[in-house]
């Protein structure tokens, strides 16, 4: 599900979607003193209250983040859509708690139901399903080496199709496909890279065919 032909990945993000809705109160701005609640401004305040320096631009490796994916709004109503990501299960839980605390503080400041937060789990870190079946990683490393490149076992800063499959009973680490710059306008692969991937897969089949 993406990645350089040398990559082997069995750790992915725990993923949560957060939808934050803001309800404002509109009135003529000339007589708005202590009365108007601008939903768009409350939304901006919510975002400022999140921990600084924890966005995709600021993080790498095992560092998690809050990613503001979409925003819309006016005085009367606004919406912020975030994705929350973290490899560590405790940390993803803490990120959700922080959002709940911010919601409570803003509702205390502006009135009940000004801010409503909806959290939804999207997928989990497949490491807990792969580690008991670590032969998958050891054989993948052998197969990549046999294809002529040095294997790189790295954490996925995202999710993979294999993450869902792993929790459905089919432990499924991610193997690189020889693709680069994924999800952008310059996403590409090479014929040479695809040849290496085919060699890797062929070797994997051979290795498992010899297992008894």
For the regions a language model picked out, list residue spans one by one.
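Conserved short beta-strand edge segments in small beta-sheet-based binding/regulatory domains
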Residues: 106-120
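A common structural junction motif
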Residues: 54, 100-110
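Conserved active-site and cofactor/substrate-binding residues in soluble primary-metabolism enzymes
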Residues: 34-45, 63, 87-90, 94-101, ...
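C-terminal alpha-helix
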Residues: 200-211
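Active-site-adjacent substrate-binding region
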Residues: 41-58, 65-67, 114, 124-172
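Zn-dependent metallopeptidase/amidohydrolase metal-coordination segment
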Residues: 76, 150-200
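Midchain, well-structured core segments that form catalytic/ion-binding scaffolds
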Residues: 1-97, 122
